[in-house]
Amino acid sequence: MAFTATVFPAEMTKEVFIGAKGHSTIAKLSDQTPIPFSGTDVMTFSFDGEINLVGENAQKGEHTNSNDSVQIRPVKIEYGVRVSDEFVKCAEEKQLEYLQAFKEGFAKKIARGLDIMAMHGVNPATGSPALTLIGTNSFDTNTDVTDITYDASDLEGNLTSAVAAIGDYENTGMAFAPTFALGLAEIKEDGISQYPQFKLGANPGSLNGIPCDVNSTVSAVAGEYAYVGDFKNAFKWGYAEVINFDVIEYGDPDNSGKDLKGYNQVYLRAEAFVGWGILDGAAFARVETSGS
């Protein structure tokens, strides 16, 4: 079974992103939309006031509203691993085992990467701000997202303030850092735990009927503790249905200073294209330490 530059079969690409959805907070709380390589525009409308009841032959009234479009442009993400050059020599069944393990690992990396990029606006590999590729398209860098100052002694107050900050938007989801979730588990009233579902690092999936997720990606950047908002209606994400896959046998493709042939290795690299868009930053609030 010879490998060169190729793409994952459509079914395998689908499996990768199904796997990613199971590990990504963003994917769990928001809806996915198909994204072509050229990107897509999502129309947004601001409908102020209420509908007008009109009688027969009556004059229709003026309505105050506005509309805009949010661009969702896919960005390229890549991940690669070095494996023994036995990969290119072994039987097809063994190669498929390699690919299955790689596919599962890549799905988890996509999930974590999507969260870190959309939440914090940084390159997941380096932690550096991605000013050109992401810019203000993240919760930490979008100036319309409300900042709530973290108070470890009043986590319930933090969440109440966050929900109040999003105004008329619906609170459809909450993302918690593990530290925040464990803090909720410690809250007691008259000696009774108020949020026992978060004890021992559990991830219950909902809080008072509202979807939530506990994930270390929330605190991947120091000082971030929680995100609250209308994930279902004011945030979209998606992927282009092609994953490029290369088996590289020569050179130093990961710039590690180690020649592949010199170490009897080959390099497996996958590239995917994901995109997301915050339709209105005012629909979200983040709980953070001041100045983070």
Model-derived regions: residue spans:
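Short, Lys/Arg-rich flexible segments
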Residues: 2-6, 10-27, 86-93, 111-118, ...
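Short, Φ-rich (hydrophobic/aromatic) sequence segments
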Residues: 12-25, 98, 102, 106, ...
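Short helix/loop capping segments that flank catalytic or ligand/cofactor-binding pockets
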Residues: 52-54, 82-83, 91-92, 183-186, ...
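Extended, compositionally biased alpha-helical segments that mediate assembly or anchoring
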Residues: 250-292
